[in-house]
Amino acid sequence: ESIASFQGVLDGKYD
């Protein structure tokens, strides 16, 4: 789920 994590970073949810 590397993509999912990356998307989180882009969305600003993955701090």
Curated annotation (Swiss-Prot):
Gene Ontology annotations of biological process type: ATP biosynthetic process; proton transmembrane transport
Source superkingdom: Eukaryota
Subcellular location: Mitochondrion; Mitochondrion inner membrane
Keyword annotations: ATP synthesis, ATP-binding, CF(1), Hydrogen ion transport, Ion transport, Membrane, Mitochondrion, Mitochondrion inner membrane, Nucleotide-binding, Translocase, Transport
Reactions catalysed according to its record: ATP + H2O + 4 H(+)(in) = ADP + phosphate + 5 H(+)(out)
An example Gene Ontology CC term for this record: mitochondrial inner membrane
Known EC number: 7.1.2.2
Class of enzymatic activity (EC top level): translocase
Gene Ontology MF terms in the entry: ATP binding
Keyword S-adenosyl-L-methionine assigned: no
Subunit structure: F-type ATPases have 2 components, CF(1) - the catalytic core - and CF(0) - the membrane proton channel. CF(1) has five subunits: alpha(3), beta(3), gamma(1), delta(1), epsilon(1). CF(0) has three main subunits: a, b and c.
Family assignment from sequence similarity: Belongs to the ATPase alpha/beta chains family.
Described purpose of this protein according to its UniProt entry: Mitochondrial membrane ATP synthase (F(1)F(0) ATP synthase or Complex V) produces ATP from ADP in the presence of a proton gradient across the membrane which is generated by electron transport complexes of the respiratory chain. F-type ATPases consist of two structural domains, F(1) - containing the extramembraneous catalytic core, and F(0) - containing the membrane proton channel, linked together by a central stalk and a peripheral stalk. During catalysis, ATP synthesis in the catalytic domain of F(1) is coupled via a rotary mechanism of the central stalk subunits to proton translocation.
Other known facts: On the 2D-gel the determined pI of this protein (spot N153) is: 5.5, its MW is: 55 kDa.
Protein name as it appears in the record: ATP synthase subunit beta, mitochondrial
Gene, per the UniProt record: ATPB
